[in-house]
Amino acid sequence: MSEKIVLIDGHSILNRAFYGIPELTNSEGLHTNAVYGFLNILFKILDEEKAQYLAVAFDLKAPTFRHKMYAEYKGTRKAMPEELREQVPVMKEVLTAMGVPLLMKEGYEADDLLGTAAKKSEEAGVDAVIVSGDRDLLQLATEKIMIRMPKTKRGVTEIENYHAQDVKDAYQVTPSQIIELKALMGDASDNIPGVPGIGEKTATNLIAAYGTIENAYAHVEEIKPNRAKEALKNHYDMAKMSKELATICLEAPLTLSFEDARLTNLYTPEAYEWCRKLNFKKLLGRFEEVEAGKPAEPEVTMVTDFAEAENLFSRLKNQKQIAFELYHEDGLHVSLTDSEQEVFCVSEEGFL
């Protein structure tokens, strides 16, 4: 069975959680509903996926290469509500307290970092699960890359899952052709213009018939209806630019390694303190369950004379299995055990 990495679209999931969960504040008046919803989605995904690696990508305020290509890119988006904006740095702090690596790169969007990380994982034989509410990411779906799209209503989260065939079933085009659709129909949320007069239905029919905008343009005289033919003839340059804007970069300068992203213990004392400060009482129970399930630290017994050593060796010689470790640290030492409850340490001091 392949290893797996979970890659989360930070702003997208925060945004979904903010609008899906009623307003919450902590005792200090800080809004917390987006952070609370994000963590619930995170834990739900991790419980289901049993992944070995995790990373979260966030957008930065700086313009990206797409803004340089088209100044009006995302120009129609409304400003983020202040109640959500104040939760973004808190979310990053909580994730950092959990030891989760954050992916951010000036000049690139979170989508580009997620796409690059997912493709690198696929090439390394690691399955990737991308969690986002952004349908642009469907272009990345393969048999090794799954897109999971949470929807939270009244505090209840449901998740749609997409591998390559699921995209085809839902949209009648392949994942890579999602880009072609955007090139023709545009994307109002990102202010990608597309071709004026071509909507989703016509775009789907054209891509189903011709595969790409380039091939559609090569056969433009065959296109029906006439309105779509004239629109593509007159605005093909706009279609080409829109395609570039819609294409996720798979070669972003990302330095994340699998070791950086390896999942260890999210339930750290620092993360517990954040959840306590944010009044996330239900989530605190997760920390307590993890602590309760941890094995007790073994008792360490120092063996300091021959009599104790003889008793130890007499006990261990009858065991089917023992573990030992030989190490140098201020002298020569050997640790021996036949259980998880007790470890015996024998040092050269007193014997040599």
Question: Residue locations for each model-derived region?
Answer:
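Noncatalytic, basic helical substrate-engagement surface that gates or grips nucleic-acid strands
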Residues: 1-131, 135-161, 238-255, 260
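Non-catalytic nucleic-acid-binding/docking modules located in mid-to-C-terminal regions
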Residues: 2, 50-55, 100, 123, ...
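A residue-level signal for conserved active-site and pocket-lining positions in enzyme catalytic cores
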Residues: 9, 56, 114, 134, ...
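Short alpha-helical segments and helix-capping/turn motifs at coil-helix boundaries
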Residues: 38-44, 115-117, 230, 309-310, ...
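Flexible loop/turn segments at secondary-structure boundaries
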Residues: 64, 225, 330-331
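Long, highly charged low-complexity segments
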Residues: 257-352
